[in-house]
UniProtKB/Swiss-Prot annotation:
The modification Phosphothreonine is found at T185, T267, T354, T809, T846, T848, T854, T861, T868. The modification Phosphoserine is found at residues 125, 175, 178-179, 212, 241, 275, 277, 280, 284, 290, 294, 297, 300, 323, 329, 334, 337, 353, 617, 622, 810, 821, 824, 828, 837, 912, 1071, 1138, 1365, 1411, 1542, 1614. Residues 102-112 have a biased composition (Basic residues). CDD domains: PDZ1_ZO1-like (cd06727), PDZ2_ZO1-like_ds (cd06728), PDZ3_ZO1-like_domain (cd06729), SH3_ZO-1 (cd12026). This is Tight junction protein 1. Residues 610-791 form the Guanylate kinase-like domain. PANTHER family: TIGHT JUNCTION PROTEIN, TIGHT JUNCTION PROTEIN ZO-1. Residues 893-906, 1388-1399, 1431-1445 have a biased composition (Low complexity). One of its GO terms (molecular function) is calmodulin binding.
Length: 1745
């Protein structure tokens, strides 16, 4: 093209860039400020170029700067103050201090036309010319899409030089050329020896920053410092990141060819020398660098930018936030780069809209250039692919992008841009368009597959083509879901015109990097996850959506939660926009009528006489805040507030705070005066604050202090005023009284009212708070903290709507009569009208009625209206409260002290209501409030706490309220089970805490539980999502919180002996261990809510184990429900552990204790969990009698001790469990018979299959989704397991695990579980029964093996969802130590382990099954799945499902012995005691094995089947395998096997794997049921080996054999190796992943740790299925002390890969998360090609293990 271009440009002018300086005077305008946003600064250099200039990142339309300033202008001076090399905050302050007018001097890059002087250089290289042209037009052109988006305009990244860089390369060349078009100089450096360096250091512009003395470049003499590098080895450097350029140079293989442009004016050399040349850190942090589309740098960069950028986290958004507000919100994830690119596309001439436009922009360019430009445009999309975050705390689903990807992008970029092959395809749509799509708004929409013989295929569309336009609809910035829906909506027979461009390389990188969509949303409703991989959330949470077509299906989005400091915290599934709108609408309408009879009773009980109208009006008003104008998902971007944001203060002393600020800081704060709504109206009745009033105050450069309702705050946010909302969190009612007496003695406001209303406010509107300050009544330190918080919030970036508000908000803010809203109640601190006598009286008189909660009743309606009706409605101590746990937790983050307390309290509270008298409840409610307040508003603390509490102790209790969509059921739960509710509340209150437990401890525990719950919730969230099952699942979740406990169990157990019987101690330990997670508690509450929701029926479930026993049994709420749920929940809770193997492990013990206390509960729980049928049983009498049959011995034994242990936690009570377990174990054989009955139920397991089937659906998905699909499968399998576990399998396991026998049986049952999800469910049930059989011996044994396996598995499970697994792991180790404890501890551990194992097995089985056999038997499973759901064990099990051990709750409950895991397969017989004995060999401890053996054969066989599921067979091995198993979910080869058709993987992989995978699954526990059974039936010993996993050593070999059986040539994996690693000396295994791969390759990844191994196609010889695993370890002996509070982290984790001795035909890529400080920006160009450090990950190529 250079020749062509030269010809075309022979008479044309070359476009080059120069810098112009302009000085403008801006006048501050109300509502706009100066109308600009700035980014950059010394502390926030451009992520790519390192430029530290202050850059105009956004110019508001209609603002004062419009037409005067432009985006990407560099700010040179403000009011005469130089802005060179200053910090961002300094620049912002200068603008703020400038008053009404600001004189701003800017430097602007201007393109000028200069006679083209390329011809000479052009001959040098056509590419060269092209690249030059490209660069010339690139500024706006297609590559501009990249460049534009990413750096060219530096839209968001303007602040960085990277933009400049991208522009610079062209612009600099041009600038040089502008004066005199200098010819590009071609330089070729040839190394004389391999280790010789080129001696170049490239800066952000891709220009020569410096030349080393005596280097090749210096000796050559043709390169000078400041030369702009146009091409590297034929690849155009325009829009290329430094990382990509570095990669290109590293790949030069000793010969480096470069085309450079002499920069006579040394413009580039004068660019501020930041860390711009540090491609590694900067590249990662500066998206611009990744412009070239280096996925590695781009992804990492963005991810780093996003969270890490400055404390204000300005950087992530700053780049992108201002300009691509609306368009880039999706791209925002890419941080500025996406936005900048997108905006550039949009704002730049047709950058996004049409590649051709770019051509127009650069007329001089040749047509080919135009194509290139188009390519560039598309390419920009490519850079967008943000690989996964590999950050330590983020369990990202996305695969870490390998640094090497960067080079690919370059080539792709080069090819696409230089030789874009655009095609216009026209055809008529048939039944379908015949296309599968990959990509997304972040990278572009690509064709991932074309249906053979379809019109599209005939017209030449092929995989890897980027779709630029369809029927004149621009596809360059559209999310994948919208693209798919658009194509689906096209009428049949309509002509379809597609403009596409061939970009195979880019597509391949996208698929391999698993990138596509990327935009930010803020939620405006509450959601409880429906699957293990789901994410629960409250209102006001921010997510980055990375895949809008998760699993290749409509309905779910893959999103990453954005936590504190805008860091990405965890990823999972959320409903898509359409579903979210439906859920939100239901949530907003339900509250008004939600509650049912019971809720109505509570709501209206206190509405007597004069209060009725008042309360009704208040209810009406409270509905308003809920009726937000925001959509369910609001697209947001991070931006700076260009004005002084209004300040709203909530809390018991808000009135004092406002007056104090306005009085002492009149130059900064001014109270916005309210006006009567209408002239002549009683001012007190209602008033409004005019928006005009606020604007006037802002125009005076002051913060407007607003006394408004939460509804008004929501409207302010909608109007994009984004007030700073500070919540002053009271410490106690007495504290409020003390403070008000001190601060405003004349005030007549009721301290109690203020306190309660504060808690309600926090519970229902916590999402509105921008910061929370914990009040200490002993001092006035809150005032300084308040001022500091306001200043900090003002300086921070704000998540703002991408677009303008749909309609202008009303011109005023309703102050809302105090009566109308507790927030604005005149009597409350929130209302400016404190004179309303009615309110004052209301404050006073409610004391008598409902106690402290009468008010809450009033607020109930408010809450309901707000969208959390259950919570508010259930504020009474005696009535179940819905906890806005997540919300509260968010607040908890704000107030750490509270969150620990709050959660535990919630737990206590749940129990306490049922247990304590109303008065006591009230008192307790008050006392717990402080605890609650952290979690939730004190007023709603009962509910909120309940949720939290329910998580740890009775998380099930609150479940009902939690689910927003289950309001109807919730009310029933809440209302009908009043006893339950009461129990919940009681528990929430302090009293539920065991006498031994200390509240603090409990609280801590709780938070942790919640957190764990969240994780578990993710894992466990029922995949099925049936309402009925959901509650059961929820209970699982409730138990889940214990997962964390389990993880920490060892340590906890060690400490817990004293609290063994105290839940509080349990929580306390948790708290300590997991405090760091508290910040995630926001989410946890959500989980808790889910629990509540699930536990809807089980409010009594207050599982304050002992205390709750009676409550659980309380039939008054729902005798059946209560017992079922409560008990079931207990057991169910363990089920969730199955997902979080550790959690479950601990939880099981706890549940065991609890359950044992409530003997019926265990049996019931099993049933309930499995299905409604069970519930009837529970409700009947079996509740106590039937469950007892199975669990009675067990529970009774427990009951004696359990009450204490119960509260403490089952894990602690392992001894108790052990005792209980013994009896169940004995009946194991008997139980088997029961299993047979349940065997009929096995069908329920098929639902799991259904989910698995879904995985195949993923198959059609593009390669892009491969990783996602992999995750999906993993999550699906987890979900299925969860469903099975939660509803059936999981729950039964919990039951099993709970009973001591279960733990004993655990090993065997666990394998069974692993066999298949269906089987697992069955086995799970048997587990509980088993416990009956075996006495302490088994318990000890279980404990013995449990600790290792459990912790391993636990870690794995947890790791899936959360980094928390890391912390959990230590706990898990502790449990290992703990198991050495008396039989009790052992038992509890073993039991948990069992459940854990089961849970593990399930997840793993599912994971493996799904990953390996999912496809294989997915279809088979698909058919059976639906029916199985109804069965007790809703959890589907693969083949086993038919023979799966469905342990009927009845049977389990009624016939303690009868509970037998009966696999219809030979496994069924296996369960017989003799088999168990034979298994004893398999199991480490024969004793333990014996009772379990019965269960074990069944379970072990299934477990055995899946390689990853081996864990389920044996706890010990399980841990190791478990880790792998979870990884298989996360990392099994399945993604590729599945239905991925990415170029990277073989599409056929799935089918072949379908065939082999089942075997593998059997080998790996994938096809635990059928395959495993086939194997085990033929070779029971193998299953035994699987079970042997329990006995780490023996089992491992067998397991190994099992794996090997399917792949004779494959290198066997030594189970012992895997297992030992877990407890390796000096190493703590944080996570494991394992999977079976064939010649098609695949990706093995660990979501929680971000570690992944990418096996290319052909790396494994044909015909061999090789199991591969890796363990992510923490080397405690080597690690230096890290100060995590200061952000010190390991740059990369320690990873051990296996099996050792395995050699690959092609190198496999090991990607490790890499968190490199932004300050370490320098990277040496020369380096090992097999080792590449990216922004977020390190990529290592290895050819053998």
């Amino acid at each position: 093209m250079s020749a062509r271009a030269a010809a075309a440009k022979s008479t044309a002018m070359e476009e080059t860039a120069i810098w112009e300086q302009h000085t403008v005077t801006l006048h501050r305008a109300p509502g706009f400020g100066f109308g600009i946003a700035i980014s950059g600064g010394r502390d926030n250099p451009h992520f790519q170029s390192g430029e530290t200039s202050i850059v105009i990142s956004d110019v508001l339309k209609g603002g004062p700067a419009e037409g005067q300033l432009q985006e990407n202008d560099r700010v040179a001076m403000v009011n005469g103050v130089s802005m060179d090399n200053v910090e961002h905050a300094f620049a912002v302050q200068q603008l703020r201090k400038s008053g009404k007018n600001a004189k701003i001097t800017i430097r602007r890059k201007k393109k000028v036309q200069i006679p083209v002087s390329h011809p000479d250089p052009e001959p040098v290289s056509d590419n060269e010319d092209d690249s030059y042209d490209e660069e010339v037009h690139d500024p706006r052109a297609g590559r501009g899409a990249l460049a534009n988006r990413r750096s060219e305009k530096s839209w968001a990244r303007d602040r960085s030089a990277s933009r400049e860089r991208s522009l610079s390369p062209r612009s600099d060349r041009r600038s040089v050329a502008s004066s005199q078009p200098a010819k590009p100089t071609k330089v070729t450096l040839v190394k004389s020896r391999k280790n010789e360096e080129y001696g170049l250091r490239l800066a952000s512009h891709i220009f020569v920053k410096e030349i080393s003395q005596d280097s090749l470049a210096a000796r050559d003499g043709n390169i000078q410092e400041g030369d702009v590098v146009l091409k590297i080895n034929g690849t155009v450097t325009e829009n290329m990141s430094l990382t990509d350029a570095k990669t290109l140079i590293e790949r030069s293989k000793g010969k480096l060819k470069m085309v450079v442009q002499r920069d006579e004016r040394a413009t580039l050399l004068n660019v501020p020398d930041l860390s711009d040349s540090i491609h590694s850190a900067n590249a990662s942090e500066r998206d611009d660098i990744s412009e070239i589309q280096s996925l590695a740098s781009d992804h990492s960069g963005r991810s780093h930018d996003r969270p890490p950028r400055r404390s204000q986290s300005r950087s992530p958004d700053q780049r992108s936030e201002p300009s691509d507000h609306s368009t880039q919100s999706p791209q925002q994830p890419s941080n500025g780069s996406l936005r900048s690119r997108e905006e550039e596309r949009m704002s730049k001439p047709g950058a996004i809209s049409t590649p051709v436009k770019h051509v127009d922009d650069h007329p001089p360019k040749a047509v080919e250039e135009v194509t290139v430009e188009k390519n560039e445009k598309q390419t920009p999309t490519l850079p967008e692919p943000k690989p996964v975050y590999a950050q330590v705390g983020q369990p990202d689903v996305d695969l870490p992008v390998s640094p090497s990807d960067g080079a690919l992008p370059n080539s792709a970029h080069e090819d696409g841009i230089l030789r874009p092959s655009m095609k216009l395809v026209k055809f008529r749509k048939g039944d379908s368009v015949g296309l599968r799509l990959a990509g997304g708004n972040d990278v572009g929409i690509f064709v991932a597959g074309v249906l053979e013989d379809s019109p599209a295929a005939k017209e030449g569309l092929e995989e890897g083509d980027q779709i630029l336009r369809v029927n004149n609809v621009d596809f360059t910035n559209i999310i994948r879901e919208e693209a798919v829906l658009f194509l689906l909506d096209l009428p049949k027979g309509e002509e379809v015109t597609i403009l596409a461009q061939k970009k195979k390389d880019v597509y391949r990188r996208i698929v391999e990097s698993d990138v596509g969509d990327s935009f930010y949303i803020r939620t405006h409703f509450e959601y409880e996850k429906e699957s293990p991989y789901g994410l629960s959330f409250n209102k006001g949470e921010v997510f980055r959506v990375v895949d809008t077509l998760y699993n290749g299906k409509l309905g779910s989005w893959l999103a990453i939660r954005i936590g504190k400091n805008h860091k990405e915290v965890e990823r999972g599934i959320i409903p898509n926009k359409n579903r979210a709108e439906q859920l939100a609408s239901v949530q907003y309408t339900l509250p008004k009528t939600a509650g049912g009879d019971r809720a109505d009773f509570w709501r209206f009980r206190g509405l007597r006489s004069s209060k009725r109208n008042l309360r009704k009006s208040r209810e009406d008003l409270s509905a308003q805040p809920v009726q937000t104008k925001f959509p369910a998902y609001e697209r947001v971007v991070l931006r700076e507030a260009g004005f002084l944001r209004p300040v709203t203060i909530f809390g018991p002393i808000a009135d004092v705070a406002r007056e104090k600020l306005a009085r002492e800081e009149p130059d900064i704060y001014q109270i916005a005066k309210s006006e009567p709504r209408d002239a002549g109206t009683d001012h007190r009745s209602s008033g409004i604050i005019r928006l005009h009033t606020i604007k006037q105050i802002i125009d005076q450069d002051k913060h407007a202090l607003l006394d408004v309702t939460p509804n008004a705050v929501d409207r302010l946010n909608y109007a994009q005023w984004y007030p700073i909302v500070v919540f002053l969190n009271p410490d106690s009612k007495q504290g409020v009284k003390t403070m008000r007496m001190r601060l405003c003695p004349e005030s007549r406001k009721s301290a109690r009212k203020l306190y309660e209303r504060s808690h309600k406010l926090r519970k229902n509107n916590h999402h509105l708070f921008t910061t929370t300050i914990n009040l200490n009544s002993m001092n006035d330190g809150w005032y300084g903290a308040l001022k500091e918080a306001i200043q900090q919030q003002q300086n921070q970036l704000v998540w703002v709507s991408e677009g303008k508000a749909d309609g202008a908000t009303s011109d005023d803010l309703d102050l809302h009569d105090d009566r109308l809203s507790y927030l604005s109640a005149p009597g409350s601190e929130y209302s400016m009208y404190s004179t309303d006598s009615r309110h004052t009286s209301d404050y006073e008189d409610t004391d008598t009625e409902g106690g402290a909660y009468t008010d809450q009743e009033l607020d109930e309606t408010l809450n309901d209206e707000v969208g959390t009706p259950p919570e508010s409605a259930i504020t009474r101590s005696s009535e179940p409260v819905r906890e806005d746990s997540s919300g509260m937790h968010h607040e908890n983050q704000t107030y750490p002290p509270y969150s620990p307390q709050a959660q535990p309290q919630a737990i206590h509270r749940i129990d306490s209501p049922g247990l304590k008298p109303a008065s006591q409840q009230k008192a307790e409610a008050s006392s717990p409030v402080p605890y609650l307040s952290p979690e939730t508003t004190p007023a709603s603390s009962a509910s909120a706490v309940n949720h939290n509490v329910s998580v740890t102790n009775v998380s099930l209790e609150e479940p009902a309220p939690a689910p927003p969509t289950s309001h109807a059921s919730q009310p029933g739960c809440l209302g009908a089970p009043s006893a339950e509710a009461a129990h919940v509340v009681l528990r929430g209150e302090g009293p539920p805490l065991p006498p031994h437990a200390d509240p603090a401890k409990v609280y801590r525990k709780e938070p942790y539980s919640e957190e764990m719950m969240r994780q578990n919730h993710i894992l466990k969230q029922p995949a099925l999502g049936h309402p009925g099952q959901r509650p059961d699942k929820e209970p699982n979740l409730a138990y889940e919180p214990q997962l964390p406990y389990i993880e920490k169990q060892a340590s906890r157990d060690l400490e817990q002996p004293s609290y063994r019987y105290e839940v509080s101690s349990y929580t306390d330990q948790f708290s300590r261990n997991y405090d760091h997670r508290l910040r995630f508690e926001d989410r946890i509450p959500t989980y808790e809510d889910q629990w509540s929701y699930y536990d809807d029926k089980q409010p009594y479930q207050p599982r304050p184990f002992e205390n709750q026993h009676p409550r659980d049994l309380d039939s008054r709420q729902h005798p059946e429900e209560a017992s079922e749920r409560g008990y079931f929940q207990r057991f169910e809770e363990p089920a969730p552990l199955s997902y979080d193997s550790r959690t479950r492990y601990e939880q099981l013990p706890r549940t065991s204790t609890l359950r044992h206390e409530e003997q019926p509960a265990p049996a019931y729980e099993v049933h309930n969990r499995y299905r409604p049928e069970a519930q009837p049983y529970s409700s009947t009498g079996p509740k106590s009698s039937e469950p007892k049959q199975y669990f009675d011995q067990y529970p009774r034994s427990y009951e004696q001790v359990p009450p204490p242990g119960f509260t403490s936690k089952t894990g602690h009570y392992e001894p108790l469990h052990g005792a209980a377990v013994v009896p169940p174990l004995i009946p194991s054989s008997q139980q088997k018979p029961e299993v047979l009955p349940s065997a009929t139920k096995p069908q329920p397991p098929p639902p799991t299959l259904t989910e698995e089937e879904e995985d195949p659906a993923m198959k059609p998905q593009s390669v892009l989704t491969r990783v996602k699909m992999f995750e999906n499968k993993r999550s699906a399998s987890l979900e299925n397991k969860k469903d099975v576990n939660d509803t059936a399998s999981f729950k039964p396991p919990e039951v099993a695990s709970k009973p001591p026998g279960a733990s004993l049986a655990g090993p065997k049952p666990v394998p069974q579980s692993q066999f298949s999800e269906h089987d697992k469910t069955l086995y799970r049930l048997p587990e509980p029964q088993k416990p009956q059989v075996k006495p302490p011996e088994d318990i000890v044994r279980s404990n013995h093996y449990d600790p290792e396996e459990d912790e391993e598995y636990y870690r794995k499970q947890l790791s899936y969802f959360d980094r928390r697994s890391f912390e959990s792991k230590p706990s898990a180790h502790l449990p290992a130590g703990h198991h050495s404890e008396p039989a009790k501890p052992v038992h509890s551990q073993s039991q948990p382990n069992f459940s854990s194992y089961s849970s593990k097995g399930k997840p793993e089985t599912d994971a493996v099954d799904r990953s390996f056999s999912e496809k294989r038997y997915d279809p088979a499973q698909a058919t059976p799945p639906p029916p199985p759901l109804p069965s007790q064990y809703s959890q589907p099990a693969p083949p086993l499902s038919s023979s799966s051990l469905h342990i009927h709750s009845k049977g389990a409950q009624g016939e303690g012995n009868s509970v037998s895991l009966d696999f219809q397969n030979s496994y069924m017989s296996k369960p017989d005691p003799p088999p168990s004995q034979s298994k004893p060999a398999t199991f480490r401890p024969p004793t333990r094995e014996d009772p379990p053996q019965t269960f074990y054969p069944q379970k072990s066989f299934p477990d055995k089947a899946p390689v990853n599921g081996a864990e389920q067979t044996q706890k010990t091995i399980t841990p190791v395998y478990n880790r792998f198993t979870p990884k298989p979910y996360t990392s099994s080869a399945r993604p590729f096997e599945r239905k991925f058709e990415s170029p990277k993987f073989n599409h056929n992989l799935l089918p072949s794997e379908t065939v082999h995978k089942p075997e593998l699954s059997s080998k790996t526990p994938t096809s635990p049921k059928t395959l495993m059974k086939a194997h085990s039936s033929t070779q029971p010993p193998e299953f035994d080996s699987g079970v042997e996993t329990f006995s780490v050593h023996t089992d491992k070999p067998k397991y190994q054999m099992n794996n090997i059986s399917t792949m004779p040539k494959a290198v066997p994996v030594s189970p012992s190796a895997v297992e030992e690693d877990e407890d390796e000396d000096g190493h703590t295994v944080v996570a494991t992943a394992r999977g079976i791969f064939n010649s098609n390759g695949g990706v093995l990844s660990s979501i929680e740790t971000g570690v992944s191994i990418i096996i290319p196609q052909g790396a494994i010889p044909e015909g061999i299925e090789q199991e591969i695993y890796f363990k992510v370890c923490r080397d405690n002996s080597i690690l230096p002390p890290l100060d995590k509070e200061k952000g010190e982290t390991l740059l990369s984790p320690l990873v051990m890969c296996g099996p050792h001795g395995l050699k690959f035909l092609k190198p496999v890529e090991l990607r490790l998360p890499h968190c490199d400080p932004k300050t370490w920006q320098n990277k040496c160009l020369p380096g090992d090609p097999n080792y590449l450090v990216g922004a977020n990950c390190v990529s290592v190529l290895i050819d053998h293990f």
